[in-house]
UniProtKB/Swiss-Prot annotation:
Purpose: Binds predominantly GDP, and also GTP.
Key words of the record: Calcium, Coiled coil, Cytoplasm, GTP-binding, Metal-binding, Nucleotide-binding, Repeat
InterPro entries referenced in this protein's UniProt entry, alphabetically: EF-hand-dom_pair, EF_Hand_1_Ca_BS, EF_hand_dom, P-loop_NTPase, Rab, Small_GTP-bd, Small_GTPase
Encoding gene (name): rasef
One of the record's GO molecular function terms: GTP binding
Pfam families: EF-hand_7, Ras
Binding residues annotated for GTP, in chain numbering: 477-482, 580-583, 615-616
Protein's UniProt name: Ras and EF-hand domain-containing protein
Disulphide bond pairs: none
Positions contributing to Ca(2+) 2 binding: 48, 50, 52, 54, 59
Principal subcellular localization: cytoplasm
Polar residues bias locations: 324-336
Amino acid sequence: MNHAELRRLFAACDGNQSGRVEYEDFTTVCRELNVPADDIRTLFNKFDLDGDGYINFNDFSSSFQEVSEALNLASLGNCLHSQRRAWDEFENTLDGDVAFYLGRQWDALSELYEGIHSTSDELLLQQFEDLIRALVTEIREHRMESEQLETSLRRTEEVSSSQLAEMEEDLQQQLIHTERRVREEEQKKLDESIAMLQIKHENELADLQTTIERLTKQYQEESKLNTPREDSVKLRAQIKDLMEENEELRASLMKAQMNVSILQVELDKLKNAFTDQKRQHERESDDLKKMVMEFQSYSSHIEMLQEMNKSLYDSNDGLRSALSQENASTKRQLSPRNEVLPRKMKPIRQSTMNQSSFTNEEDTLALVKCWAEKYLDSGVSVQSEMDAMSGIDYDSDDSHHSVETVHHSYSCVPSELEVSEVKPEALRSVARSTVGSISSSLRRRLSAFPVKQNEEDLLDTQDLAPVYRLVLAGDAGSGKSSFLLRLSLNEFRGDIQTTLGVDFQIKKMLVDGEKTNLQIWDTAGQERFRSIARSYFRKAHGVLLLYDVTSESSFLNVREWVEQIRESTDEDIPMCIIGNKVDLRAARPEGSCVSSIHGEKLAMNYNALFCEASAKEGTNVIEAVLHLAREVKKHVKLGRRSESQVKLSLHKRRKTLSNCCGV
């Protein structure tokens, strides 16, 4: 037996993989080979040549030939070799380096495979092989995906570093230009000061020269008149005075030069101080601008939240008053004078309530609760939506929809058996009083809302144009606010602020020749505002889901947004997936942006519309909203048609039951 086979056989005997075979491991192997218990200690001592209490590989290889006949270790080695060869053959059937993909689990899996192979269970062996193949394939796919993500991250870091380098270079150029300009100005001022001092000094020298010439002439004239001795004495005195005056002038000149040097040093200090103060002023100005912008943003959102809180309080008061009035009217209906009439009343529509009659106060309270939940979910909590759509959902006292909704939920008519007992005029008076009480309670509740309508809004509500709610969704930075600004005002701003909470706009469009009002809600894309976005998805008719074509992360998060939308809505609503910022694709390297093919495949998977747009250039902005509005219009019409069919079938079923059973 060669060295490799001996090494493999020694590893099989080494149960704990410690590199040496102890007595317990040797005993286990001997029992598997049916060696008598009396001979185990003798055989172990033959292997343990150095007597240290365990068998290393040198002892094992030296004494193997001597005790191989007793232990039959060769047959054990051949068996292990065949099992190892089976694992190697299976490993060759897999693509790539299996040990590289399995890592530290390779040894355990190979031993498990050898154990299963030794049992000759083909079904279990096939299942284990399929499991290993699937595991290797999945690990390979994960590694490829990790490499792709690392490549994307590396590209993003390179782009960011290049942009930072360009910004630093521009800033450095601006600083150099500013420093050069300041130096030139200060040098010009210094040259002017030195020139003025030189002119002054030259004038003083000219005056001195004139004085010397005048004194020289006087001396010559006096020398002619006086004796030579007196002339010489006077001349010496004059020369001495002139020399003293010349020394004084020189001293004053040196002092002036020293003053100029001191002024130059002070000027340099003032320059440095001016530069530092200018930088400090710029930093403080930037901080102040940021603080002002944050203050304005927080103030606007605080006002919005206060208005929303006020609306919720007013809505709560209205619901309480409506509940109390309904309880009072129920008690009046249960009085002995009207005992015959309520006993035979039945509801006109029961789509929003259970199908029992109004025979007790508990059913009435349940109906009022359903009515409250319906109107709280219809958008009353948002003040801006009330102001914009005051003529549709919650209008003034003359609103047809408000009265009709309350009438369908609460109005009562006599049953068929009651027609013969009660006069029609009395029934009509009772129905009018019931509807009037509910309508008056609704009017009192709505009067608490600060609704302000001008003449144009009243005209719009009279036209009864259909209103659809569209929600803008997507990651932060995908261009939702710019998309809404381009749609509403046909403008683009590069310095638009990040949306905090929600934003709201109304767009009037002609959809298939019909005037349509679109409420478009811009939701914030940050994680902390996801709960706010879910509440708007719940009552939306359609969703504009945006992603940035230059950002793979925003595209990958589209699936998460779709799941949130489906979790928030009771049924599937129309969606339009929009790839924004296509104008930036030409400036990016090929392959770094999300292609339109991937966007189309994703939209097909979710049965949604798809287009690519540019809020900066205005490309496909109106078209995307128009197509989604058409789908929303179709969806709403189908929903109303199915709802009317369900109500009709329920009405027929009740009529059949009443005819059969006399209810």
